Amino acid sequence: MTKLIVGLGNPGSKYHETKHNVGFMALDRIVKPLNVQFTENKTFKAETVATFINGEKIYFIKPTTFMNASGLAVRAFLAYYNLTVEDLIVIYDDLDMEVGKIRFRQKGSAGGHNGIKSIIKEIGTQEFDRIKIGIGRPKDKMTVVNYVLGKFDKKDEITIFNTLDKVDKAVNYYLQTKNFEQTMQKFNG
C-alpha cells in the first residue's frame, strides 16, 4: 500500500499557522516524530517528503501553488508515481465545523473550499478520502477571507493543537489498519 497524504494551505511565512493552513500544520505534526524534513520540489510545485511507515511507502505533500491551485500539485504527483485516487488522503480546514472538530469523509463535494475544488477539477473526481478540521466561522463582520487567513486566538490555538494530536493518532491508526472506514468510526467527532 502506497499512500499520498496531502495537507492544504498557502506557502510562505505570511500564512504560517493561519486557519487556512491547518492542513500544513497537520502534516508537520504527523512527520515530526519520523525525523524527516519537507523539501521543495519544483517539479510537483510542492514541499514533499517520503518515508516508510509499517513497511509501506508514504508520501506527504504540501502544495506550494497557493490554495486555489492545489489540484495541479496533486494531479502531477499522482501521475508521476502512478498512484490512484484510492491512494489519496487530503487534510484541510472546514469553516462549517466547530473549531477543533474532525470529520473523515470518503467522498463528497468541495463544500465551497477552493483547494478541494481545484483537486476535484484536476483529478476528475470527488471520490477521495479526506480529513476535515473545523476552524469555525467568523464572528461579527469579519470577512471569510480575513478570517481564514488570520491566526487562531489563544483559546482556539490550544484546541487546534490538541486536534492536530488527534489527527496524528488517526492517520497513524489508519496506516496500521489500512481501513479508512474503521478510522472514521473511531475518530470522527
UniProtKB/Swiss-Prot annotation:
Cellular component, GO annotation: cytoplasm
Subcellular location as annotated: Cytoplasm
Magnesium in keyword set: no
SUPFAM superfamilies from the UniProt entry: Peptidyl-tRNA hydrolase-like
InterPro entries: Pept_tRNA_hydro, Pept_tRNA_hydro_CS, Pept_tRNA_hydro_sf
Chain coiled-coil ranges: none
Active site: H20 (proton acceptor)
A family per Pfam: Pept_tRNA_hydro
Subunit structure, as described in the record: Monomer.
Protein name: Peptidyl-tRNA hydrolase
Protein species of origin: Streptococcus mutans serotype c (strain ATCC 700610 / UA159)
Source species taxonomy: Bacteria, Bacillati, Bacillota, Bacilli, Lactobacillales
Gene responsible for this protein: pth
